[in-house]
């Protein structure tokens, strides 16, 4: 504080004012009493831990894609195993896959379907899977959890299922439904809210029974 008295600015100050200013500067610079007022330390908050993926859920071979599928299923209340089965048939997990008909991405979304379910970029794996999963949930709800009819709707459109009151007599659609339903191993998928679905499909597990990412 003797050093401060030698500065012109501080020599002009009255003793009480000088004492207050000196004390404030001393406290700020050393962190005593108030901490460093002008340069507070920002403590970085740790990122929340990712929920582990159950070991019995299929893998795409990519931890990033597996996480996208699991998270989309958890959010929408759709079994990730079902989503995996659909993606395996649609694109074999090739995220930039394109069909001659104009379908794009992991879940082979057509432009109208992407727009309908809020996907602005069909080439973005997360957006593609999110929209495709929303469509699957919509179809499951429309057809009361019937997996085969939902798959037929995904492939040929729900209008075709309504028209034929069942799986349309198209060779491609019938083969599509058979392959995916057998791969998934179920013919019924309950339509549930996400919290209930997580319990139904055993999505919340501890790290000892989860896959390693």
What kind of region is each of these model predictions?
Residues 5-8, 30, 84, 102:
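A general, composition-driven signal for non-globular sequence regions
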Residues 1-19:
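N-terminal Sec-pathway targeting helices
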Residues 41-213:
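Catalytic glycan-binding domains that act on GlcNAc-containing polysaccharides
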Residues 29-46:
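Signal peptide processing junction and immediate N-terminal pro/mature segment
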Residues 14-31:
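Hydrophobic membrane-insertion alpha-helices, especially the h-region
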């Amino acid at each position: 504080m003797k050093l401060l008295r030698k500065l012109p600015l501080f020599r002009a100050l009255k003793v009480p004012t000088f004492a207050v200013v000196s004390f404030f500067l001393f406290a700020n610079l050393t962190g005593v009493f108030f901490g460093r007022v002008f340069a507070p330390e920002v403590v970085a908050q740790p990122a929340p831990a990712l929920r582990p993926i159950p070991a019995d859920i299929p893998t795409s071979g990519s931890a990033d894609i597996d996480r996208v599928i699991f998270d989309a299923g958890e959010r929408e209340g759709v079994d990730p195993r079902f989503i995996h089965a659909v993606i395996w048939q649609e694109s074999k997990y090739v995220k930039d896959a394109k069909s001659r008909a104009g379908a794009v991405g992991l879940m082979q979304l057509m432009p109208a379907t992407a727009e309908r379910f809020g996907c602005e970029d069909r080439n973005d794996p997360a957006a593609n899977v999110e929209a495709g999963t929303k469509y699957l949930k919509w179809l499951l709800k429309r057809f009361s959890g019937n997996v085969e009819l939902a798959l037929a709707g995904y492939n040929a459109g729900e209008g075709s299922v309504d028209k034929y009151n069942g799986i349309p007599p198209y060779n491609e659609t019938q083969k599509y439904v058979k392959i995916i339903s057998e791969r998934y191993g179920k013919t019924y998928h309950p339509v549930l809210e996400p919290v209930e679905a997580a319990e139904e499909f055993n999505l919340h597990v501890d790290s000892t029974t989860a896959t390693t990412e």
